[in-house]
């Protein structure tokens, strides 16, 4: 878990499907009742649901494992087991769910009451009523329930704010937020006072409002993890308008123009799309005696750097301490929000390319063969292991069915071509049997 409670690593395991039953009708006046074993019920899935009342991932610090319930077993008289209820896990709005191993984004949960099954429950095993044929009207075959999906997930929470305040530490972002909104951030005259994003609702005129977030201070190298690092930049991705706060006083001994360039370089290095957002320069602490002169120097350097062909960005002179210049800043910010659509976190073209690429990948082989240290053979792979788990070895016909499935998959032929001989041990998970050529 990160310092800012915006990431969490958890395990989700869906419920196993219920086992199918091997049973026969044994009723008076029904001498040839036939099979009557019902199917097992579906295992419970683990479903994430957006909860607008949550604002952090704090709950996942203490509860990291979420398990769905198994489905009921099949019963006699063809009765199927009851499916298990899904496990609903509430997450904050704005949570991004990633596969911890691959880093792939599974879902971006941004809509109210949005749901997504992060781990699907296993299907119930079929009872012997499903395997009756004219050649075998009374089969002693049933399947075990399919195991539920088991995943390690990485959760990331980005602040859902319309406007983000960015700038170096101690330039007055927290003070500014406190006087224009209902937020009450911690304020202090030292670096990194803000270590988590503070959010406030800003009212503009009658009925207009927007959410503003005081993003923790950035430093040079933040995109590669320097200082409090990349954690800060993650929070900026969802904002639509950036207010770049600069300290025009001499209290910190900083150069506003160098600060301005450094912060924008960090934003661009982390994600090029951050620079597509409208950005207003907020010249703060203009109540200080030397502020006007430093602002003039800043404008001169910026104009020289941009050249005659580029338009100067908007600059608003304010003082968070004396509350001057804020109404004009907020009104202009509200106008920009009305003109600016939401930004996608992930490029749709890139996702489309990935989808096309994966669509043409060769189908994964149903099994792999390797050698153990003692010379035995080991079979592995999702498909063959799933068949193994779903085979009920208490019944000879089920074992024979599993042997036929392996033969159809080409297991016997592959082992033979690799040099397996009569009497060699072949293992699947913890099960061991002898190879017969």
Swiss-Prot record:
Its main location: cytoplasm. Residues 359-437 form the OCT domain. Gene3D superfamilies: GTP-binding protein OBG, C-terminal domain, GTP1/OBG domain, P-loop containing nucleotide triphosphate hydrolases. Keywords: Cytoplasm, GTP-binding, Hydrolase, Magnesium, Metal-binding, Nucleotide-binding. GO terms for biological process: ribosome biogenesis. GTP binds at residues 167-174, 192-196, 214-217, 284-287, 319-321. Its cofactor is Mg(2+). It is found in: Cytoplasm. It is an enzyme of class 3 (hydrolase). Mg(2+) binds at residues 174, 194. Residues 161-338 form the OBG-type G domain. Its EC number is 3.6.5.-. Residues 2-160 form the Obg domain. PROSITE patterns: G_OBG, GTP1_OBG, OBG, OCT. GO terms for molecular function: GTP binding; GTPase activity; magnesium ion binding. GO terms for cellular component: cytoplasm. It comes from the Bacteria. The keyword Nucleotide-binding applies. Belongs to the TRAFAC class OBG-HflX-like GTPase superfamily. OBG GTPase family. An essential GTPase which binds GTP, GDP and possibly (p)ppGpp with moderate affinity, with high nucleotide exchange rates and a fairly low GTP hydrolysis rate. Plays a role in control of the cell cycle, stress response, ribosome biogenesis and in those bacteria that undergo differentiation, in morphogenesis control. Monomer. This is GTPase Obg. It comes from Lactococcus lactis subsp. lactis (strain IL1403) (Streptococcus lactis). The lineage of its organism: Bacteria, Bacillati, Bacillota, Bacilli, Lactobacillales.
